[in-house]
């Protein structure tokens, strides 16, 4: 019965995870849909790139009141939303904003959000089962020392190690998906240099405050196997290889997205920026 209940819970989680409404997730971040009069260029970017990606529906656009530079997507291809922070809109030029939006649209098109949600549910289930195994092991310790119970060490070791292995696989899957989204975004915009430039700005902007708090060893690289995203330098290097027109596959080569000469992306009327980073339920900092 316990195993059946566990499988039922996992099945429910896997079925429910991809169906959380995109608007509900955006409300957690206090995202607001901007007026098209004030963000017409941004709406044009989302619409043009969505059409190029052949999405069944154009994702809804939300602006997040945050100073940090961030963008993310949520939902399914037929019910998706893209959130961009005010900090990102103010720090990047219009080409870079288009590249970042294309990256998020690529995640939507490739159903990365659903894949990662399912992987997250499976990982959390393994963590839960591992905790149960630890609790059972502690309860059986007296009986083990008394010699009345034999502990299945192999099964117990697998149970203990499974959450770590699942997390490593989840991180690897995330890195692969990020590389694919970068390349897809370059094809959608026809402008890989813009995404490379945006990634460089994002990398320079994040982490400096915390690095300055740690005077020694602050430049020690985080182990690549434990990263959810590939190293920015590697992502930029891959994009730089696409800048030469001859490197584009002919069937995927697209003209650049038509943009006005004046890069005007604004979110007037949304109120003051939230200056203080906060921790939100899905686990994202902004």
Where would I find each of the regions flagged by the language model?
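Post-HEXXH active-site segment of zinc metalloproteases
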Residues: 111-142, 195-208
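Cytosolic-facing loops and C-terminal tails of multi-pass membrane proteins
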Residues: 141-174, 184-286
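Transmembrane alpha-helices and immediately adjacent membrane-cytoplasm interface residues
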Residues: 2-26, 47, 51, 158-170
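Alpha-helical membrane-inserting segments
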Residues: 12, 16, 20, 126, ...
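Peri-catalytic and regulatory segments of divalent metal-dependent proteins
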Residues: 13-117
């Amino acid at each position: 019965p316990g195993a059946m209940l566990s499988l039922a819970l996992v099945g429910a989680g896997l079925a429910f995870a991809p169906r959380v409404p995109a608007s509900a997730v955006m409300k957690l971040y206090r995202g607001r849909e901007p007026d098209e009069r004030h963000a017409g260029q941004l709406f044009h970017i989302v619409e043009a790139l969505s059409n190029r990606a052949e999405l069944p529906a154009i994702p809804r656009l939300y602006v997040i009141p945050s100073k940090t530079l961030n963008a993310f997507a949520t939902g399914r291809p037929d019910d998706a939303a893209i959130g961009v922070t005010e900090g990102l809109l103010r720090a990047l030029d219009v080409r870079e904003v288009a590249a970042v939006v294309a990256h998020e649209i690529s995640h939507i098109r490739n159903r990365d959000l659903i894949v990662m949600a399912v992987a997250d549910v499976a990982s959390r289930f393994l963590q839960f089962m591992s905790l149960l195994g630890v609790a059972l092991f502690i309860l059986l310790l007296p009986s083990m020392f008394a010699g009345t119970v034999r502990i299945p060490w192999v099964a117990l070791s697998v149970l203990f190690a499974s959450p770590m292995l699942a997390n490593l696989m989840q991180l690897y899957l995330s890195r692969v998906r990020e590389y694919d989204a970068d390349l897809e975004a370059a094809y959608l915009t026809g402008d890989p240099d813009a995404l490379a430039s945006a990634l460089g700005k994002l990398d320079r902007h994040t982490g400096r405050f915390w690095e300055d708090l740690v005077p020694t060893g602050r430049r020690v690289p985080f182990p690549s196997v434990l990263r959810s995203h590939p190293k920015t330098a590697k992502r930029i290097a891959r994009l730089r290889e696409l800048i030469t027109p001859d490197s584009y596959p002919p069937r995927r080569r697209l003209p650049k997205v038509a943009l006005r000469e004046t890069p005007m992306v604004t979110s007037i009327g949304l109120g003051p920026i939230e200056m203080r980073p906060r921790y939100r339920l899905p686990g994202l900092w902004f």
